[in-house]
Amino acid sequence: MSTRVVSTDAVAVGAARLFQTLGGACAVLAGAATLLYSVAFVVLKDATLYSLLQMVGSLAATVALVALYERVRQADAGLALWAVLAGVVAGFGSAIHGAYDLANALNPPRADVLAD
């Protein structure tokens, strides 16, 4: 059995590289989900599918935005911070909207809640 000493800098670089890879994969996922969302919304008109795609795509976009922030924050920290905050808030807002529509598609509300 061998023992290998790994410095904390090497671990930090590996974790950063892993998150950049995850961010890239989430950016591709967000793009694909957005394209499929538009087809489901306009052509298929399937509320369950487009709500799920909106929720997944917007959550994946927030991961991609944070990974992008990590890459550009050295250029202009203030602008990068403002952009990532605006993007993440918008992403979570879109995810909440998609989750609300998904809940209504799976469990349609009654027309008159006071009827019982």
Language model features: what each stretch is:
Residues 2-116:
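Hydrophobic, aromatic-enriched alpha-helical segments typical of multi-pass transmembrane helices
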